[in-house]
Amino acid sequence: RNAGQSSPFLRTFLEILELPERSCSLPAVSGILSSEPVRNRYGLSEDDCRVITAWAKEAGIRTDTGLDSSRSFSRLNSFSYGLERMMLGAVMPSEDPYEEAGGEVLPYSSIEGNGIRAAAMFREFVRTLSQAVSDLRTKRTASGWQSFIGSMVRSLFSTKDYEEDFMLLTEAVGDMAKYSGAAFDLSGKAPGDPLIPLEVLRTFLTDRLGREPSGSAFITGKVCFCTMIPMRSIPFKHIFLVGFSQD
């Protein structure tokens, strides 16, 4: 298995890159929270994550209408409304929390004791993830993506025990920065520092992190970088010559 499949850190990172174009459903979001590097970042255990998911379901959370492109769910089923219910229920000891909340939001009253901290961490995680998903939709230069990804990883992941995976991700983003200098836009103009959309970043990193770790993976991907010597024949339909000098 390649690094992108076997590493919880890299696998979860790639899942986050897909969120801007897919439904931000409760199963998708809770799956990200339950991954070890993310839950460790927020000081949560596996049991905490299971309980949080149960609370979220009971509070009516289904999807985030602010992130999901579909409108099949109302605001009452959004993360923002469900989290408001959860936090109001946690802090209001009144026998009639609905009346105390002004009658606008029905507090979810099953959270108490040590569960209040877990609920607060869940709210912080959802807010951070929501901001990251929104920011991922912005085109950036390669250097801009380097800075953004570093910041996003620090805010959502614990890199403890995953230093090698984080280094692999950093190297992959660095490689994209090197290649982007030779990129051409659709007009045929070669920009010095082109803006790169999320789709290009995601495709590049998925391919880069999905490569086999050994040299035996030659000619197994969609693009192969190699010399033409000592080949007797070149087994490719399309050949692009890069880096030729006058010599």
Model-derived regions: residue spans:
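Polyanion-engaging groove/track-forming segments
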Residues: 1-247
